[in-house]
Design a protein with these regions (language model features):
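Surface-exposed, low-hydrophobicity beta-strand/loop segments enriched in small/polar/acidic residues
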Residues: 1-156
Length: 156
């Protein structure tokens, strides 16, 4: 992931309205959690989000990298570690994990949950005969992913 030049998960707000500070959430990692993964809170901790894109109301919570121990976006959180996630606000920019084989041809492409901690190109109501999906973010770069890749997005 870092070979693509991405070193951070939180990139910042669009308007500097929050002084460049993310909203952090701490909790115990319930499994191995990858930085940039879409995660969900449970009573006992935080785990990668396995909720389908057609289930609306998902929290916009992404695993941060372990900055306290100077780790990188390539270093996963281990089971039972006290981890940090970012509760993203609309308009903030993050580098998040996008699933393999996603061809993002324009900036602003809507992205939804892939039910494994990654995002994928969303199915929108304009697609006839399919169920729409909750849009969590919009791409802020053009890329074709080969493997799970960090992609810069703006939170919906």
């Amino acid at each position: 992931m870092a070979t693509k030049g991405k070193r951070n998960i939180y990139v910042g707000p669009a308007d500097h309205g929050h002084a460049g500070k993310p909203l952090n959430v701490e909790g115990k990692a319930l499994g191995v959690v990858r930085p940039g993964a879409l995660v969900a809170e449970a009573a006992t901790g935080i785990d990668e989000n396995a909720v389908a894109a057609t289930i609306f109301g998902a929290s916009r919570l992404w695993a941060d990298k372990d900055q306290q121990r100077t780790k990188t976006v390539d270093d996963d959180w281990a089971i039972n570690e006290n981890m940090v996630a970012i509760r993203a606000r609309s308009g903030e920019f993050l580098n998040v994990l996008v699933a393999d084989a996603q061809t993002i041809t324009k900036s602003g492409t809507p992205l939804s949950s892939n039910a494994d901690g990654t995002l994928k190109i969303a199915v929108t109501p304009a697609t006839v005969g399919v169920t729409s999906e909750e849009i969590l973010a919009y791409s802020d770069e053009i890329i074709t992913t080969s493997g799970v890749t960090l992609v810069r997005v703006v939170v919906a």
